[in-house]
Each structure stands twice: as C-alpha cells, then as structure tokens.
Amino acid sequence: AGFSADVAVFILRAQPFHFGHRAVIEQALAQAKHVLLLLGSSHQPRSPRNPFTHEERAAMIRASFSADGNARIEIVPLMDVLYNDPAWITNIRVAVERETRRLEPGNGNPSIALVGHSKDESSYYLRLFPEWHSIDCDNYRGINATDLRRAIFDAGGDISDDESAVVQYLRSVTTDAVIELLRGLMVKRDVVEVVEEDRFI
C-alpha cells in the first residue's frame, strides 16, 4: 500500500501518552507497514519523572488506537541509559534489528525509518542513526508530557471530577481512554506515594 518504509521506529517515554504522541504514530502508520515503539525509562522505579510502568503506558497507547492500528504497532520496553551513551545506541540498534527480523522475516533488506521532531532538541538522536531514513513530524500543538504530569501532580493526583480544571485540561491534550486509565492508576498506592514525593521536591 505505497509505504515508504517497512518499519518506522519511534522512541518515546509517554509519561503519559498524549495527542502529540498519537499524531506522530498516525503519521508513522501512514508511511510504514509496521510501527515499532521503543518505550524509554522502562525498568525504572516509579518517580515524579517516571510515574507509570511500561505496561501501563503500553495500555494507554493501545487504548488510543483502533484494532487495525494496533495490529501494526509493536511496543517494546527500552532500558534507560544516558542518551549520549554508546550502550543506549546499541540497545536501540539491537531492539530494532531483532523486531524487524520478526516483523519482516523474508525481507533481506528492510527499510527502516526513524520518526521524530527534528526541530526538537530532545530528538537529536535522529542524527545518531544515519543508516536509517527519517520521517519528520511537527510537534503537535506543542504538547509535552511534562506539562501533563505537572497538572496532575498539582491537583494532588485527583482527577476524579469531570468538571475540574485538571480534567478539562487533560481532555484537551489526551484521549478519554487515557484519562480513564489514569484515573485507575492515580489511586494506586505506589502512584499516590509518587504524588506525595513530588510535593517535597
């Protein structure tokens, strides 16, 4: 179906998932047969910067796409090493090569594209993998997950009230499915403890 790549790779943290991530993944789905999401910070203890596990974040992503989209999306946890560390680059190459072999078993020369915002300083890693094409996406309405976490934490983690300012804000930046999942997560004891910890930082 006229795809420009066999596999599009998007490195993200999705703490939590929002419309910006979704727009990038939709663009990737339009251009590649398979979309491989590498979820960073995957084996970290919960913290104000990483409140959600990779399983919880994968559930947010899955809940935001149709069955057809999900059938072409692979989500793989990525260990955190400092971004400029050669070990991090190796981890990504190994994960991408392994998953590409699995997704395209008969393909001796699969085309791989890295997806990101080249204008965004956090995406300088696009330049770290010159052997892959790049699919450049605009930063969707300037949304970032730091602002979402900040809003939730500033509300003391309470996102139960549909009329509250924090829920109105969340509706403008993420899917209803993610908000429902977040509601379940924000009352978990270990997530409540992260919200408490954040108050003292």
Label each residue range with its predicted role.
Residues 1-200:
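Nucleotidyltransferase catalytic core that binds NTPs
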